[in-house]
Amino acid sequence: AKTGRNGETYLPGRRENDALQIISIVNFKGGSSKTTSAIHLAQRYALRGYRVLAIDMDPQASLTTMFGYRPEIEFAESGTVYDALKYEDPVPLSQIIRKTYFHNLDLAPAGLLLSEYETETAYALQHKVDPPFTQRLAIAIDEIEANYDLVIIDCPPQLGFTTMTALLASTGLLITVVPSMLDVASMAQFLEMAGETVQTLEEAAGPIDWNFLKFLIARYEPTDVPQSQMAGFLRSILLDQVLTTPMLKSTAISDAGMTQQTIYELDPSQVVKKTLTRILESVNGVADEFENTIQQAWGRETD
C-alpha cells in the first residue's frame, strides 16, 4: 500500500474504470530469462499489493514447475490452461486456476498437453471454428478479469499459435533480450516475424493496439565489455523502450532455481549477503521501473 498526502493509504492496483493489464513476456530464444523475469515480476507485484494471475503458456511448464508442481504427473491429462483454450468442450479459466503459496498470486498452470493447441488451431482455422485462436485467451481471461489487477503470461520461445494467442490477449509486451550478438540477432528475427504476422492479422481482424512494448536487458554482466557495448547499441536504437534497469546475471538466481525457488524465497543465511543485496536491487529495480509503465497505462502520474 502507498500513503497519500493526508496520510491515507491506498492499494496500487486497479481503480474504477481501470482495465486489467495483461502482460506477455516473450522471446524467440530459450535461455533469455523469460520465466525468471515472469515469476520474479509476479511475486514482486503480489508483495506490493497487486492481485496477480500468472499464466504459463509454455508446454515445457517451467513457470508451473517453479511454483512447486510436477506438471508431467499432476497435469498429465487435465487441469492446465489448455483446458480453457481447447476447441472441444473448453472449461472456464476459473476452474484451472490454482492458489500459490504467495498471497495475492494465483497460477494458471501449463503441461505438455498444451502443445496440442498448435495442431488443433491449424485444424480449427481450416474448418472456421469459433471463436478463433485470436480471441480464445482474451475470452477466457474475461471471465475472471474482475479478480485481478495484473496478468503476467510466460510465453513459449517460438512464434506459433500459442504465442500469438497470448500476444493478442495482451495489453502490453515485455521482450527479454540477453545482450549478445546471437541473442540480439534472434530477437531481430523474432520482431520481424512477429511484425509480419501481426500485420496479416490486422488486415483480417482490425488494428492491434498494445499500451506499451518494452525491452528488458537480461542476464547482464556489467564487467563484460562486449555485453556493455551491445546493451549500449540496443539503447541507441530502441531508446526509452529499453528499461533503464537491467536484470543482472547472478549465481543467486541460478542457485535458487536449483531448488525451484526465487530470490524472494531464499534463506538469507544460505547466500553471501553482498550477492543477495546486489541481485535484489536489480530485480526490484526492474520491477519498480516496469510498474511505472503499468501505472502510466492506467493514466496515472509516476515519479
Language-model features: locations:
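P-loop NTP-binding core
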Residues: A1-D303
